[in-house]
């Protein structure tokens, strides 16, 4: 699995941990091992610009996900890369550490924990999950919590 990360935010971020949680979520979701993903960390001004341009939102947001091959990605237990399978371009996740830091204070955890949560959230969006409706939100957020808990349990060993 190829995961590229670029920190253009100016914030001190443990990019290895962001990569690890993204890889864990993709592995747990059974995503094809040939899949490609990029993660970009940006400053608050650029995130506000992206949010306005692509989502019609005002101001910055915490995470944006831009799927590429949505729908063609294998995900689910036992659906890892088959011989001769083509790489899947999952897409891009854009994170804003400054927004994450503010949300972390409200949530009562570290900025790193918030960035890990947002990374998993972005991965799930790339895999087609959404939270526009209450039932979708329950499903997505429960899966997000499960993936984070399983990742944290692997790190504490």
UniProtKB/Swiss-Prot annotation:
<dbReference type="Pfam" id="PF02130">
    <property type="entry name" value="YbeY"/>
</dbReference>
<keyword id="KW-0479">Metal-binding</keyword>
<keyword id="KW-0862">Zinc</keyword>
<comment type="similarity">
    <text>Belongs to the endoribonuclease YbeY family.</text>
</comment>
<dbReference type="InterPro" id="IPR002036">
    <property type="entry name" value="YbeY"/>
</dbReference>
<dbReference type="GO" id="GO:0008270">
    <property type="term" value="F:zinc ion binding"/>
</dbReference>
<keyword id="KW-0690">Ribosome biogenesis</keyword>
<feature type="binding site">
    <location>
        <position position="131"/>
    </location>
    <ligand>
        <name>Zn(2+)</name>
    </ligand>
</feature>
<dbReference type="GO" id="GO:0004222">
    <property type="term" value="F:metalloendopeptidase activity"/>
</dbReference>
<keyword id="KW-0540">Nuclease</keyword>
<keyword id="KW-0698">rRNA processing</keyword>
<keyword id="KW-0255">Endonuclease</keyword>
<dbReference type="GO" id="GO:0006364">
    <property type="term" value="P:rRNA processing"/>
</dbReference>
<feature type="binding site">
    <location>
        <position position="121"/>
    </location>
    <ligand>
        <name>Zn(2+)</name>
    </ligand>
</feature>
<keyword id="KW-0963">Cytoplasm</keyword>
<dbReference type="GO" id="GO:0005737">
    <property type="term" value="C:cytoplasm"/>
</dbReference>
<feature type="binding site">
    <location>
        <position position="125"/>
    </location>
    <ligand>
        <name>Zn(2+)</name>
    </ligand>
</feature>
<protein>
    <recommendedName>
        <fullName>Endoribonuclease YbeY</fullName>
        <ecNumber>3.1.-.-</ecNumber>
    </recommendedName>
</protein>
<comment type="function">
    <text>Single strand-specific metallo-endoribonuclease involved in late-stage 70S ribosome quality control and in maturation of the 3' terminus of the 16S rRNA.</text>
</comment>
<keyword id="KW-0378">Hydrolase</keyword>
<dbReference type="GO" id="GO:0004521">
    <property type="term" value="F:RNA endonuclease activity"/>
</dbReference>
<dbReference type="InterPro" id="IPR023091">
    <property type="entry name" value="MetalPrtase_cat_dom_sf_prd"/>
</dbReference>
<dbReference type="InterPro" id="IPR020549">
    <property type="entry name" value="YbeY_CS"/>
</dbReference>
């Amino acid at each position: 699995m190829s995961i590229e990360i670029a920190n253009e935010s100016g914030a001190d971020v443990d990019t290895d941990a962001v990569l690890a949680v993204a890889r864990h979520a993709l592995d747990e979701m059974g995503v094809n091992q040939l899949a490609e993903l990029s993660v970009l960390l940006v400053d608050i001004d650029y995130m506000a610009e992206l949010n306005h341009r692509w989502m019609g939102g005002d101001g910055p947001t915490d995470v944006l996900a831009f799927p590429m091959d949505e729908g063609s990605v294998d995900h689910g237990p036992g659906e890892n890369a088959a011989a001769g399978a083509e790489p899947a371009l999952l897409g891009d996740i854009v994170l804003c550490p400054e927004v994450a830091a503010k949300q972390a204070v409200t949530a009562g955890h570290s900025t790193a924990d918030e960035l890990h949560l947002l990374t998993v959230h972005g991965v799930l969006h790339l895999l087609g999950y959404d939270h526009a409706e209450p039932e979708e939100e329950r499903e997505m957020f429960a899966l997000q919590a499960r993936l984070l808990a399983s990742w944290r349990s692997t790190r504490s060993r």
